[in-house]
Amino acid sequence: MPITRMRMRPWLEMQINSNQIPGLIWINKEEMIFQIPWKHAAKHGWDINKDACLFRSWAIHTGRYKAGEKEPDPKTWKANFRCAMNSLPDIEEVKDQSRNKGSSAVRVYRMLPPLTKNQRKERKSKSSRDAKSKAKRKSCGDSSPDTFSDGLSSSTLPDDHSSYTVPGYMQDLEVEQALTPALSPCAVSSTLPDWHIPVEVVPDSTSDLYNFQVSPMPSTSEATTDEDEEGKLPEDIMKLLEQSEWQPTNVDGKGYLLNEPGVQPTSVYGDFSCKEEPEIDSPGGDIGLSLQRVFTDLKNMDATWLDSLLTPVRLPSIQAIPCAP
């Protein structure tokens, strides 16, 4: 039959209220805040009756230490007490008030309101899940690289590798081979057939493609321009001058040349007067006026210089004068 013992929270309250352990006191009893002396034995040295009396009392209460049967081990007592405090759901550490250094190091805790039954169940299930996850991590960490390599070397591969391929792919491959027609082997002959490419010879230039042609010159009757019309007038005048017969005459002691056949000089120049005729709106009006001006100039000129000009006169050098129609 198991021995029943007091839980840690009521046992701790009883130890604080007894004032038998030095340093274990209430800081704020209303808020259930208390402190525990937490001196480091390795740095400052321990006094079992003073610094480790709370941890020893808890070891005696849990049955892990009995006076006279085991050697005292204050470090183990302190570690067991710390684990028990951290596992309590209704006690938490106030870290901003704790002092972890020096000979007067203390830890401050707060007692929370008691948990209900449902809260205790949730807390228990959470702790069990944490324990399982820790165990899994520990088992994974224990496996060394040597054991992993040994497992790989001991594993044997099967001789039949057909199971590695996908069955569907093999079926598709068989269907494709069935649909593909069988190719007959190609026979290579040493004789090659004669073949040629028809080549059409094209001349280098386009002169052979078209016959040489000369454009006909335009006839004089078809290609008449204004310049040709102007050139005809002097030619006609020259012909008239060549056909006409120039006759010297003397009027009032002045010599003149007359080319009107059948007309006596006296009858012509006796009644000759320099009267301006009215302008005739005809194509030969300008020519008539020009001839009249020429005769007027000849009449007014001195006849003595004509004697020197009669012998060397050259008709082609005479200025062309348009005649009246």
Swiss-Prot record:
Other noteworthy facts: Deletion or rearrangement of IRF1 are found in preleukemic myelodysplastic syndrome (MDS) and acute myelogenous leukemia (AML).
Regulation: Activated by MYD88.
GO molecular-function term, one example from the UniProt record: DNA-binding transcription activator activity, RNA polymerase II-specific
Residue positions where N6-acetyllysine is found in the record: K78
InterPro entries reported in the protein's UniProt record: Interferon_reg_fac_CS, Interferon_reg_fact_DNA-bd_dom, IRF1/IRF2, WH-like_DNA-bd_sf, WH_DNA-bd_sf
Stimuli inducing this protein: Induced by HPV16 E5. Induced by HIV. By interferon (IFN). Induced by N-methyl-N'-nitro-N-nitrosoguanidine.
Protein name per the record: Interferon regulatory factor 1
One GO process term, biological-process aspect: positive regulation of transcription by RNA polymerase II
Effect of A67P: No effect on transcriptional activity
Post-translational modification (record): Phosphorylated by CK2 and this positively regulates its activity. Sumoylation represses the transcriptional activity and displays enhanced resistance to protein degradation. Sumoylated by UBE2I/UBC9 and SUMO1. Inactivates the tumor suppressor activity. Elevated levels in tumor cells. Major site is Lys-275. Sumoylation is enhanced by PIAS3. Desumoylated by SENP1 in tumor cells and appears to compete with ubiquitination on C-terminal sites.
Functional summary from the UniProt entry: Transcriptional regulator which displays a remarkable functional diversity in the regulation of cellular responses. Regulates transcription of IFN and IFN-inducible genes, host response to viral and bacterial infections, regulation of many genes expressed during hematopoiesis, inflammation, immune responses and cell proliferation and differentiation, regulation of the cell cycle and induction of growth arrest and programmed cell death following DNA damage.
Residues in cross-link Glycyl lysine isopeptide (Lys-Gly) (interchain with G-Cter in SUMO): K275, K299
Keyword Cell membrane on entry: no
Listed PROSITE patterns: IRF_1, IRF_2
Cellular localization per UniProt: Nucleus; Cytoplasm
One Pfam family it belongs to: IRF
Gene (UniProt): IRF1
Record keywords: Acetylation, Activator, Antiviral defense, Cytoplasm, Disease variant, DNA-binding, Immunity, Innate immunity, Isopeptide bond, Nucleus, Phosphoprotein, Repressor, Transcription, Transcription regulation, Tumor suppressor, Ubl conjugation
Ranges of the DNA-binding region feature: 5-113
